Amino acid sequence: MQSNKTFNLEKQNHTPRKHHQHHHQQQHHQQQQQQPPPPPIPANGQQASSQNEGLTIDLKNFRKPGEKTFTQRSRLFVGNLPPDITEEEMRKLFEKYGKAGEVFIHKDKGFGFIRLETRTLAEIAKVELDNMPLRGKQLRVRFACHSASLTVRNLPQYVSNELLEEAFSVFGQVERAVVIVDDRGRPSGKGIVEFSGKPAARKALDRCSEGSFLLTTFPRPVTVEPMDQLDDEEGLPEKLVIKNQQFHKEREQPPRFAQPGSFEYEYAMRWKALIEMEKQQQDQVDRNIKEAREKLEMEMEAARHEHQVMLMRQDLMRRQEELRRMEELHNQEVQKRKQLELRQEEERRRREEEMRRQQEEMMRRQQEGFKGTFPDAREQEIRMGQMAMGGAMGINNRGAMPPAPVPAGTPAPPGPATMMPDGTLGLTPPTTERFGQAATMEGIGAIGGTPPAFNRAAPGAEFAPNKRRRY
């Protein structure tokens, strides 16, 4: 359907304007008679119609799936514009082909630029509006040069359009990325990258020229250079050739084959020999470059193998070093744990020894306190002995007094003590009770009734020196 419309439009452009309008009006009148009236045009801007022509374009049919809109590829150059044209008139001129994204007019030089939604719509507008008369001038519509496009060479074999776009998107927004292939679909090692602006293209060109930009594992960098803007669609029409003196001189002879033996033939053959030599030298250069590439690839593979082996060795050494370091750390941890256990054991023993000493000290203090409160038997015997000796001395003093007359035949009363032949008193040892004065002392008789406590002398008796009566 699209090709038929394009063919009809191209055919109409080669007919006179009046005949074209008359023929189109007749065709439109016949369509109105045969078909019902068309539905109303929606207000969403997806369909548009021109004032001069009744042809409508469905914009949905001219947009490919996933195609980016308003790119540099859909930018048109419009020449031979009237000097008084405005942007509003130019938008109205292209209103049939959808909403324009960019309109620029250079009134002094008589040209301008306009950007449409898609490449297909721009192609249709170019075909329909090229050579259209406008205020006494014929419009010249061409595709604008893409100044932000780059040519990429030395692409690896397994680089696709998507990978190429992803790789160069680090420099800026990429509108289109294409890997050029031959007629069999095999990659040629070349590609085209189109950016949305010149700064991104300049950045990519500078970075790739200064460094080595790799796209795959294969370490062959790509080369980037500005793309040659060549017009292989319109070419050079006869009407655009400058008709100067050199033009007329060159056009004196029509196209022909040179006759053998003539002047033209001789120099034509010399030109052919030069061209053949250039071709042979170019082929030789290509062969040398190919051999050098193959040699470099072989060296690169060998070096890559050695590099991988070296990396494996380094990784093995690194792992061994890491294992050794882990073992050292483990040994240090074990030593620290052992030292900690030894310190804990020593601390435990020290605490036990301290507790034992404290217990012994406590027991010793308890024993000393018990002894201080309750004197032992030896001390008690000494004290009782001293008391007994004091009492004996008092008795002896008493015995020095003249005895009372005792009737004959009366037995002597029992005294408190009896002098032994060895000069000692016949006293019984004191008891071990705490209060010895309460015990009954043998060998000491009652003197005038109940014996006094602590060996007190009888009333009226004389006391020893340094002794006083106890009450």
UniProtKB/Swiss-Prot annotation:
Where are the annotated segments for DBHS? 54-373
Tissue-specificity statement: Heart, brain, placenta, lung, liver, skeletal muscle, kidney and pancreas. Also found in a number of breast tumor cell lines.
> Modified residue Phosphothreonine is at which positions?
6, 428, 440, 450
Q: Note the CDD domains from the entry.
A: NOPS_p54nrb_PSF_PSPC1, RRM1_p54nrb
GO biological processes: activation of innate immune response; cellular response to angiotensin; cellular response to hypoxia; circadian rhythm; DNA recombination; DNA repair; innate immune response; mRNA processing
The known PTMs are summarized as: The N-terminus is blocked.
Q: Which Gene3D superfamilies match?
A: 3.30.70.330, 6.10.250.1170
Q: Where do the segments described as Disordered lie? A: 1-51, 443-471
Q: Where is the composition biased (Basic residues)?
A: 14-27
Stretches of Polar residues bias are at 1-10
Q: Where is this site: Breakpoint for translocation to form NONO-TFE3?
A: 377-378
Q: Where does the RRM domain start and stop, copy by copy?
A: 74-141, 148-229
GO molecular-function terms, A-Z: chromatin binding; DNA binding; identical protein binding; lncRNA binding; RNA binding
Where the protein is mainly located, per its record?
A: nucleus
Keywords (alphabetical) are:
Acetylation, Activator, Biological rhythms, Chromosomal rearrangement, Chromosome, Coiled coil, DNA damage, DNA recombination, DNA repair, DNA-binding, Immunity, Innate immunity, Intellectual disability, Isopeptide bond, Methylation, mRNA processing, mRNA splicing, Nucleus, Phosphoprotein, Repeat, Repressor, RNA-binding, Transcription, Transcription regulation, Ubl conjugation
Where is it localised? Nucleus; Nucleus, Nucleolus; Nucleus speckle; Chromosome
Q: Give the GO cellular component terms, alphabetically.
A: chromosome; fibrillar center; membrane; nuclear matrix; nuclear speck; nucleoplasm; nucleus; paraspeckles
Positions bearing N6-acetyllysine: 5, 11, 198, 295, 371
* Modified sites of kind Phosphoserine: 147, 262
* N-acetylmethionine PTM positions: 1
Residues forming coiled coils: 268-372
Functionally, this protein is described as follows: DNA- and RNA binding protein, involved in several nuclear processes. Binds the conventional octamer sequence in double-stranded DNA. Also binds single-stranded DNA and RNA at a site independent of the duplex site. Involved in pre-mRNA splicing, probably as a heterodimer with SFPQ. Interacts with U5 snRNA, probably by binding to a purine-rich sequence located on the 3' side of U5 snRNA stem 1b. Together with PSPC1, required for the formation of nuclear paraspeckles. The SFPQ-NONO heteromer associated with MATR3 may play a role in nuclear retention of defective RNAs.
Q: Which disease is it linked to?
A: A chromosomal aberration involving NONO may be a cause of papillary renal cell carcinoma (PRCC). Translocation t(X;X)(p11.2;q13.1) with TFE3. Intellectual developmental disorder, X-linked, syndromic 34: A syndrome characterized by intellectual deficit, delayed psychomotor development, poor speech, and dysmorphic features.
Subunit structure and binding partners? Monomer and component of the SFPQ-NONO complex, which is probably a heterotetramer of two 52 kDa (NONO) and two 100 kDa (SFPQ) subunits. NONO is a component of spliceosome and U5.4/6 snRNP complexes. Interacts with CPNE4 (via VWFA domain). Forms heterodimers with PSPC1; this involves formation of a coiled coil domain by helices from both proteins. Part of complex consisting of SFPQ, NONO and MATR3. Part of a complex consisting of SFPQ, NONO and NR5A1. Part of a complex consisting of SFPQ, NONO and TOP1. Interacts with SPI1 and SPIB. Interacts with RNF43. Interacts with PER1 and PER2. (Microbial infection) Interacts with HIV-2 Capsid protein p24; interacts with high affinity. Interacts with HIV-1 Capsid protein p24; interacts with low affinity.
Q: What is this protein called?
A: Non-POU domain-containing octamer-binding protein
- The protein's organism comes out as Homo sapiens
Taxonomic lineage is: Eukaryota, Metazoa, Chordata, Craniata, Vertebrata
This protein's encoding gene: NONO
